[in-house]
């Protein structure tokens, strides 16, 4: 079973530029942002969400490890918020590295996340997934997530 290890500053320094780039690419692929603006917008969003990096309050960034002596197989980042409905975790990023996909690490990570959430008295876990990411959608649906909102777009020529 995989484990979550608090992300180190070095891991965060390696993660951030790649995450900014990947998020920009996903927003362009989804048709939400124009390519010319995507990288700047992505960097701005990350700067607003994580102004203090891994030290940002209520944000939890973990490396996902199978063997603590080996490089991580992935990462997960969620934010904790509180409301009248109880504590909620919102997953901002979750990734299993390409060479480790299809080995059950994603499913294991979702199980570990549930354990962590229960220990933190979290009542709900939420996330956003791009509609074109069918592999992720399948993982989330088969681990108990349900669609709560759905945005649709029609491009006019």
Predicted regions, residues:
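Generic anion/oxyanion-binding catalytic loop in active/binding sites
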Residues: 1-4, 129
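Conserved acetyl-CoA-binding loop-helix of GNAT-fold acetyltransferases
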Residues: 93-96, 102-115, 119, 138-142
């Amino acid at each position: 079973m995989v484990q979550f290890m608090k992300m180190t500053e070095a891991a965060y320094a390696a993660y951030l530029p790649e995450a900014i780039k990947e998020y920009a690419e996903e927003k362009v692929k989804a048709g939400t942002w124009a390519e010319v603006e995507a990288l700047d917008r992505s960097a701005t969003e990350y700067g607003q969400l994580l102004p203090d990096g891994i030290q940002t309050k209520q944000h939890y960034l973990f490396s996902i490890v199978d063997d603590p002596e080996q490089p991580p197989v992935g990462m997960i980042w969620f934010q904790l918020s509180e409301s009248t409905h109880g504590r909620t975790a919102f997953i901002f990023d979750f990734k299993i590295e390409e060479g480790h996909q299809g080995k059950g690490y994603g499913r294991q990570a979702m199980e570990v996340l549930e354990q962590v959430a229960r220990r933190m008295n979290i009542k709900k876990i939420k996330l956003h997934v791009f509609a074109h990411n069918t592999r992720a959608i399948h993982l989330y649906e088969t681990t108990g997530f349900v669609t709560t909102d759905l945005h649709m777009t029609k491009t006019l020529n």
